């Protein structure tokens, strides 16, 4: 269920500012999005797993705060990130 090192490296390569970038908001949002998608799939199978549901809500809140920060700092980076991640239909 947790992200493997290979998955993290692939995501950071796509969304980070450079290969070893782990701190930029884009990289953090991309990693959170992957974790959110994985947890959502888990909860489809295990509907009564309320402990994981709370963790999902915490991750969604953290991603929302990071996206809000990116939108305040640079709207074009925000729009690009949203489009690349497939958020906001």
Swiss-Prot record:
A UniProt-annotated Pfam family: Ribosomal_S15
GO-annotated biological processes: translation
Record's GO cellular component terms: cytosolic small ribosomal subunit
Keywords, in A-Z order: Ribonucleoprotein, Ribosomal protein, RNA-binding, rRNA-binding
MF-aspect GO terms: rRNA binding; structural constituent of ribosome
Record PROSITE patterns: RIBOSOMAL_S15
SMART domains assigned: Ribosomal_S15
Described function: One of the primary rRNA binding proteins, it binds directly to 16S rRNA where it helps nucleate assembly of the platform of the 30S subunit by binding and bridging several RNA helices of the 16S rRNA.
Family, per entry: Belongs to the universal ribosomal protein uS15 family.
Oligomer and partners: Part of the 30S ribosomal subunit. Forms a bridge to the 50S subunit in the 70S ribosome, contacting the 23S rRNA.
Name the UniProt record assigns to this protein: Small ribosomal subunit protein uS15
Organism: Mycolicibacterium vanbaalenii (strain DSM 7251 / JCM 13017 / BCRC 16820 / KCTC 9966 / NRRL B-24157 / PYR-1) (Mycobacterium vanbaalenii)
Gene: rpsO
